[in-house]
């Protein structure tokens, strides 16, 4: 393996792990950012801003080619989830979402934004009545 090939593979691995995007394969990994001190926080600002940036990145590289999103989410904050939903719906590219593991609450709403949905054999969904609050 040449030094350049090694560096390219290392950069691709870094992007997939740190930024949750595989540019070469037009794939986004949509899951919560987990640290050692917390459980899965679900859909939050970090998750939504990362997804929106990655969608724009892939769209700017090529508007026509499809994008695949791998989703695993226990749910989360309504407004952040709707930001993800809107960003996916706004995309001119064909979006396929593949659901893994637990797709719960807001995760099920995000799944509906896709042009194509694939559910892995051992994935499970959880849907519940919504709650609302007023912002003054």
Segments the model singles out, each with a brief description of its role:
Residues 1-136:
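Terminal-region recognition feature
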